[in-house]
Amino acid sequence: VRTWYHSWRAAIRIARRDAWRFKGRSFLVLAMIALPILGVSAMDLTIRTSELTASESLDRDLGRADAKFTDPGLGGVPILQNPDNTQYTPVKDYDNEPWPDGKADVTKAIPVGSRVLTDTTGNGKLRTKHGLLNTRIHELKAADPMAKGMLRLNSGHFPEKTGEVAATTHFLETSGLRVGSKLTARSLDADYRIVGSYELPNELKADEVNALPGALLAPLDKALKADQLPGTDPSTVHLLTVPGHSFTWNMVQKVNTFGITVDSRTVRMHPPAKADIPLYQKSGWSDGRSEGSDVTVLASAATVIGLAMLEICLLAGPAFAVGARRSRRQLGLVGANGGDRRHIRAIVLAGGLVIGVASAVVGSILGIALTFALRPTLENLTGQRFGSYHFRPLELAGIAALAVLTGLLAAIVPAINASRQTVLASLTGRRGIRRSSRVLPVVGLIAFLLGAAIALYGSTLTDQFAIVAGGSAIAELGVVALTPALVGLFGRGGRWLPLSP
């Protein structure tokens, strides 16, 4: 063994052989390290998959339309909005005047040459096998290519005639009806045939029926008002495709002068600079983003990961120590044949490296498989469909690297202890007389009290999660240092305890 490369190569071969020889211990350590990696990698892939891309989100909101016009009910006064249409306000300040109210004329804002598809929603009570069910009524020509992606057909077909409706899968499960059943509404004599089932990707648990424009809401609203009951409260938005299929930010601002908000595909895919957004120039308005919240999330994640790694190291370390003790004759032979302390440490550390790499591979593969297996269940729990699978190689590699690092850290102390043994003690198996340290319990007690104080200070007087993590780690290491003294103390106190039955 002359070079660093050959030294570590031989150490890894020895460690791999020992890991295969002692399968039970190796599997125990592998499981302790791989389980957290499994959970974190599955969580990472699940979170990334649940985060829709801009294109996926637009398909659910706009279908294949270029823009969506919405009347905010401000009476048609000029307004300002942000690019993603989540914030808007009148251009004029109404501090000392009544707030504008009323409907705007959407038709005046529609560009020449546009193709328009109306999208109207209202509410009504529909008769089911279990009684009346308050249901959202969605009037949209869902079979139109412009609406593709907003509603996902599961069976049958979307309405093609006035007397046909489609219903969400959740509505059919709740109502006890099925495709082919007749559907009626309170106060309305007309019957409708359910011709298909569908789902809303963002609202899997929505009770909704779909009909052609004017087929259900208008007659139902008229019948309810005739019976002196609350109407369907319909609201309409307009989906548009424009020549060139590009609804720019300038076009959005022009439509805003008619008191209409716009959700534009082009603007959401390519938002303008903050300086070009008049809304953000007004006092009290901003994009609402906070860098501090991102820092807090990262700090919290780092704290949890750091403490988890410490726990795993403390749990897996004794297993490596036991392995090194069982292999002390083998390590003694290495020393007897010219190996020095560096080679002994390398062999024990290689055991941690081998187990760490195996844990990284097993944990990552099982985490990805778990994500695939649990996806339908998670979608039902969250009530929305995930997007396509988004693998982040750097993130998954970083998670796997944590397994390797944890294995190495867990093997450091056993490696140092093994390298300190003499060749004679290793070959004969004699450990000699070992006295417990009187300094270690004192250091442990001081570390525990200091760590607890730091963690308490960090959690109550500051917002620094790193302080909490550091204090917790110091306190935990203090408890570890106190453990031999505590075991001895309880052992001496056991003489006064009765015998177990």
Question: Where are each of the predicted segments found?
Answer:
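Interfacial "coupling" helices/loops that link adjacent transmembrane helices in transporter permeases
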Residues: 22, 314-356, 427-431
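Alpha-helical transmembrane segments of integral membrane proteins, especially early/N-terminal helices
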Residues: 257-278, 315-326, 356-372, 403-406, ...
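Short cytosolic juxtamembrane segments of multi-pass membrane proteins
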Residues: 417-435
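Alpha-helical transmembrane segments of multi-pass membrane proteins
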Residues: 17-24, 342, 346-359, 367, ...
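Alpha-helical transmembrane segments, especially those used as permease/efflux helices
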Residues: 1-4, 9, 24-28, 42, ...
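Small-residue-rich transmembrane alpha-helices
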Residues: 318-320, 329, 353-383, 396-420, ...
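Membrane transport/envelope proteins' first extracytoplasmic loop
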Residues: 1-29, 33-313, 322-325, 342, ...
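Short juxtamembrane loops and helix-capping segments at transmembrane helix boundaries
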Residues: 280-291, 371-394, 456-475
